[in-house]
Amino acid sequence: MAITRLNAFHANPGRGAALRRFLASVITDVRAAPGCRSCELYEALDDPEHFAVVEVWETVEAHKAAGKAIAPARLEEAMTLLASPAVGTYFRHVGGADA
């Protein structure tokens, strides 16, 4: 069964556009990772400095392996854009048409 990872990001004041560009560039790499079914970027309707990334993976392990493949310099770049650490949680599908 696939898993879904929900991630929340808050940009430093005035850095929302830069964080959006950064996340969009990372998503391109994530989508190409083994085990990734989908990866989408969302911006909050009421806050252009608040983003969510919704990822669907074959397994938690596939997600973790993809994360390890991100270059440390890219992670350091992200830290300069974030107001607080990103928050991510794994979910499993438990209801709806495909349950």
Short names for language-model regions:
Residues 1-3, 18, 34-36:
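Short, flexible segments with low predicted structural confidence
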Residues 17-21, 49-51, 63-65, 98-99:
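Short acidic, gly/pro-rich beta-turn/loop elements at beta-sheet edges
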Residues 2-10, 40-67:
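Short, well-ordered beta-strand segments in beta-rich or mixed alpha/beta enzyme
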Residues 2-3, 40-49, 76-99:
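Glycine-rich beta-strand-turn "strand-cap" elements at beta-sheet edges
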